[in-house]
Amino acid sequence: MDGQLAQLAALVAHGNEWMAGDRARQCTVAAGTTFQYVNAVRFTLSEGRNVERPITAEDPSAWLEGLAERGVNSLWLDPRTADPGPLPAHIAAAFANGTRSSILAAGHNAERWIAAWTVRQPRAPDNRIWDVHYVGSSDRSGLREVPAIRSAHERLVGAASAARDLANRFGWTDWAQWFAEALTVADSSAPTARFFDDALPPSSELARRRLFALASGSYVFGGMGSWNDLAAPNPNGEAEYLEVSAELYTTVLLAVAAAVNPVTLTSN
């Protein structure tokens, strides 16, 4: 799974747990795998109601405390599935800052937070090459519709199954096996995400952990050699490959958002 998307998900999931629990304790999300290659992170609120000058936090805990002080009571992952430019979204996702998904902080005054990842130390001995800067601003656009957990789960099972079946027909045996393994967590009683398993707090409900694990295992949109770098074995199959890939990317993003956003399971 893309580390930038995973970090958004982790901030939302762990941030909501912190807001709903004991706020005297620190949020430990920065110690998790979504920050393992991050050298520094900064959060800057650039403008908003009653903001006379930029407000900066140097870690997630300080950011969350500032949000709470400004009346924020929940965080939401807002997935952007539309094509961000000339490249299809599932192709653009292979590049740094390729996703335009963001965090919506809701409460007394809504804020939208967008991340920018920059390589600052390309030869860092501990591989912490990235500096991440989240910029927040007041927001009135609201949250795009995100499916309920159950419907997101069903749609992603269908999309991953379609990708598996296409891979089998095209002779891509390794990819067929990849998706088959991803689908094994769909009904697991103890799901483990293939990547970033700690993005969700341990207290997360089974349905959320199962959906995130399925999304993590189904995310195949990287650089060279990834699923989105392939070409169909015949011209007639190219359109189907692109259609299946676009649907898979959309459903993965929606599934990640459904897994971490603070909706009640009884409504799904």
Where are the regions that the model predicts?
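Alpha-helical oligomerization segments
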Residues: A180-N268
